[in-house]
Amino acid sequence: MGMPPLLFCWVSFVLPLFVAAGNCTDVYMHHEMISEGQPFPFNCTYPPVTNGAVNLTWHRTPSKSPISINRHVRIHQDQSWILFLPLALEDSGIYQCVIKDAHSCYRIAINLTVFRKHWCDSSNEESSINSSDEYQQWLPIGKSGSLTCHLYFPESCVLDSIKWYKGCEEIKVSKKFCPTGTKLLVNNIDVEDSGSYACSARLTHLGRIFTVRNYIAVNTKEVGSGGRIPNITYPKNNSIEVQLGSTLIVDCNITDTKENTNLRCWRVNNTLVDDYYNDFKRIQEGIETNLSLRNHILYTVNITFLEVKMEDYGHPFTCHAAVSAAYIILKRPAPDFRAYLIGGLMAFLLLAVSILYIYNTFKVDIVLWYRSTFHTAQAPDDEKLYDAYVLYPKYPRESQGHDVDTLVLKILPEVLEKQCGYKLFIFGRDEFPGQAVASVIDENIKLCRRLMVLVAPETSSFSFLKNLTEEQIAVYNALVQDGMKVILIELERVKDYSTMPESIQYIRQKHGAIQWDGDFTEQAQCAKTKFWKKVRYHMPPRRYPASPPVQLLGHTPRIPG
């Protein structure tokens, strides 16, 4: 009598109920008889609805409390599986899996019977029970064949160290037997090779170790001419990595004799694929093809997954050819670390570009905020007396020099000295009477941290620099030898610097310029306006407290007389 595969949830539709019970539809009840002490899994899937967008819970009737999802608990839910690590006699009972989606609810039940079975104790009364972990397999007399150890567990369980037994004795590699993992190859089969076999495997789950056993009742069978057992060359009980939602076609290649009329097909849960997915045809068997060779025929029958869904993973799809069978198990691909790496680098690059853009756009405000938040009142130890040396054009009388004087001698000190706390040396205001121009520039510029130069389009306004070589040398020394930072302010937009002194051209080329907007209103005399923010940005960090607020200066434009 054929036995259902070990630990495999969709073995057969044992008891189709399809009776509405409350708000859920009972799909079927499956009967399992397992010996105590065994790890036991059961996978709950119902292809019409378990498409990844469902809520799935296990509970033991009559309790409505869900089975724990804590993987350290002996009985727990692992995704769609219920896992017993291991089974105990008191676990006998009915367990229900409830599958809900947005529009429907289904129940699948297992009637679990746990009994005591002693390993290699044939005298025990219960040892003759046909349990779910006992299989019946056939071997062909006079040929070579193989036995299969069926092990289906969730991915959280690691299986290794598979051993084979005949009776109670472990099978070692010999001319007769060749254990190869889940397969036991048997050569020169005769009647004496029938009997009781078993396979055991070590199961590791979260560091805990268990032993899984399958019991196999083997019968031998005479096969004459035309009765050769088909050989499935692919699949080989292997796994296939496939993306969720993709299309997949898998060929089953079978070699068989020309006289054999064996049925070749794909099954899932011991049901023909086309019958199992009759309503949706998402997974279907293809048309069989064959190729005649000298001594045999190569048959190919494929299975097509139009769309791979979550319930397909970890679920065996088996190709059958008479007594031969081989399965595939679909697995989700391992994470593509290259994609994560490229994505991470792209995100980092985007972040870096964004930070650079934000900094370049708001760097003036960022720097000024940082200075105001983390400022220090301690004077720098650089032996400098002034924060900036102000050099501006001298206009002849009866000219527009009144506006320049107002900016330099009134507004500039008002904003930078009184509001911001800087100390300025203004050429034309702070030198001692009778000092030579070259001496003033050369001596005092060395006591300043910045050089602030104001320029206007009129080249004649800089005649004091253009015609006096010593003054140009003093400014040039400050720029080149002392490495002083320069703030160049255009009183009006200067389109052509070619007529300017070489020192001014050098400053413009190396440091750029800030353009004064010509606004003399009281609002423009605030340190928080755009122009003054740019000036403060180029100034050194403020070292002195600002003066108390004073009334801002008004400006009366000069009326030509």
Curated annotation (Swiss-Prot):
Residues of the active site: E470
Stretches of the chain found on the membrane's Cytoplasmic side: 359-561
Keyword annotations: Disulfide bond, Glycoprotein, Hydrolase, Immunoglobulin domain, Membrane, NAD, Receptor, Repeat, Signal, Transmembrane, Transmembrane helix
SMART domains linked: IG, IGc2, TIR
Stretches assigned to the Extracellular side: 22-338
GO molecular function ontology, one term from the record: NAD+ nucleosidase activity, cyclic ADP-ribose generating
All copies of domain Ig-like C2-type, residue ranges: 22-113, 128-215, 225-321
Chief location of this protein within or outside the cell: membrane
Catalytic reactions on record: NAD(+) + H2O = ADP-D-ribose + nicotinamide + H(+)
Cystine connections: C44-C97, C149-C199, C252-C319
Subcellular location: Membrane
SUPFAM superfamilies in alphabetical order: Immunoglobulin, Toll/Interleukin receptor TIR domain
Tissue: Predominant expression in the lung and epididymis, with lower expression in cerebral cortex and testis. Expression in the brain is non-neuronal and associated with the cerebral vasculature. Not detected in any cell line tested.
Membrane topology annotation: Single-pass type I membrane protein
EC nos: 3.2.2.6
GO biological process, one term: positive regulation of interleukin-6 production
Segments passing through the bilayer: 339-358
Signal peptide residue numbers: 1-21
Residue positions the entry lists as glycosylated: N23, N43, N55, N111, N130, N231, N237, N253, N269, N290, N302
EC top class named in words: hydrolase
Coiled-coil region: none
Binding partners and assembly: Interacts with IL1RAP; the association is enhanced by IL36B indicative for an functional signaling complex and inhibited by IL36RN.
Assigned protein family: Belongs to the interleukin-1 receptor family.
Protein name: Interleukin-1 receptor-like 2
Organism: Rattus norvegicus
Lineage: Eukaryota, Metazoa, Chordata, Craniata, Vertebrata
Gene: Il1rl2
